[in-house]
A protein has these predicted regions:
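Short, solvent-exposed loop/beta-turn-alpha elements that line the ligand-binding surface or hinge
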Residues: 32-37, 210-216, 287-296
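Short, flexible helix-coil linker/hinge segments at the edges of structured domains or between repeats
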Residues: 148-172
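Conserved C-terminal helix/tail region of periplasmic/extracytoplasmic solute-binding proteins
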Residues: 308-360
Length: 360
């Protein structure tokens, strides 16, 4: 009698352009190798034929999806009642700059009083990540300058809608609006922001990534949660543990291969070079990819949730601790014994590293 056959378990993975442990594991082929035994059908979400499945990177409604990406969509989805839980968090600091025209007369955050602050706007987005990210950056800068963000003058910068994945380099519509004089200041982060600030016609009012307080550095990409839907985790905990083990392996490899990591990350950042990735994240990038659930990372998610509630990007509050399931990662870390140095780079170390990069 022929034994019954079982269909492979469908496992989707997703990571948005940026420095992620998942992206590194995919670039090196480790994730594919870990699930090549035939029992699991590993698929990239961006390759799905269904638009709704692709958009699960934002709405988190696809079963069998392990997602590593920006925190705004993850928090929004949880607020909307999705069952995805956080099984790990990475903290990769990145450039976060308020930029103005050099001839604007704006030199410090306090000088932003009464100025036109540009916020991108995507009218059809499930959750407008870019707008929330920019407003978060401005609010932090205004508060550091002793100003009331509620009194700020916000100006819409219309952005075209797009579907995940965004394969082409996006137009720099915020930069266009700034240079054309439609707004007085914009917020840019990551490699895009780092590349833009090299323009001698622009002035950097503040780089929030230089703040000592990590909660002042919280934005869409910092911290990044790793999520999976609760039903899939309950049915297939061994698959989730295997996935996390690959990310831990990749993070440990990255910690000793700093020269290679920026090039690998740049492959997931369309239109930007390894040098720009290194400039945006600093030379400690390779030591920042280890998934963790340390209290400071969780506090970063809680701070972002507070902001999104206060500024009405989400409608419903929820308990951060109930959103997190620490068991899978705890099981993996007991086996892999990660290096103790992996964690959030201190801003003072970032400032030194940034000076070293600019001196090259």
């Amino acid at each position: 009698m022929t034994p019954p056959t079982h269909s492979p378990v469908e496992l989707w993975y997703s990571h948005r352009g940026g420095a992620t442990a998942t992206g590194l594991a995919v670039q090196k082929g480790w994730l594919q190798e870990a699930f090549a035994d035939g029992g699991t059908d590993l698929r990239a979400l961006e390759d799905a034929a269904s638009r709704d499945i692709r958009l699960a990177h934002y709405h988190h409604g696809q079963t069998g999806l392990i997602r590593e990406g920006g925190n705004i969509a993850a928090i929004w989805a949880r607020s909307e009642g999705q069952s995805a839980v956080v099984i790990g968090i990475t903290w990769v600091d990145e450039y976060q700059g308020i930029l103005v025209r050099r001839d604007s007369g704006i030199r410090t955050p306090a000088d932003l009083r009464g100025r036109r602050l540009g916020l991108p706007l995507r009218r059809r987005a499930l959750i407008d990540l870019q707008r929330a990210s920019a407003q978060r950056g401005f609010v932090t800068a205004l508060e550091l300058g002793g100003l009331d963000p509620r009194m700020a003058k916000w100006v819409h910068i219309e952005r075209p809608d797009f579907e995940f994945p965004q394969r082409l380099t996006a137009r720099d519509v915020e930069l266009d609006a700034l240079r054309a004089g439609h707004v007085d200041a914009i917020f840019l982060r990551g490699a895009q922001g780092y590349a833009a600030v090299q323009d001698p016609a622009l002035h950097e009012v503040i780089d929030l990534n230089c703040q000592d307080d990590p909660l002042k550095r919280v934005n869409h990409g910092t911290p990044r949660p790793i999520t999976v839907d609760r039903a899939f985790l309950d049915r297939h905990p061994e698959i989730v543990r295997r996935y996390l083990a690959v990310l831990v392996k990749g993070a440990r490899w990255a910690a000793t291969h700093g020269d290679e990591v920026p090039t690998l990350v740049a492959a997931d950042v369309p239109g930007h070079t390894a040098a720009e990735v290194l400039g945006a994240h600093g030379p400690l990038l390779h030591r920042s990819l280890l998934p963790s659930l340390r209290p400071s990372y969780v506090a970063g998610l809680a701070e972002q949730k507070r902001f999104l509630l206060e500024w009405r990007y989400i409608d419903h509050d929820f308990d951060i601790d109930q959103w997190i399931d620490p068991a899978p990662l705890a099981d993996v870390l007991r086996i892999h014994h990660p290096d103790a140095h992996a964690g959030t780079p201190h801003a003072a170390r970032w400032n030194i590293a940034k000076e070293q990069i600019h001196a090259r």
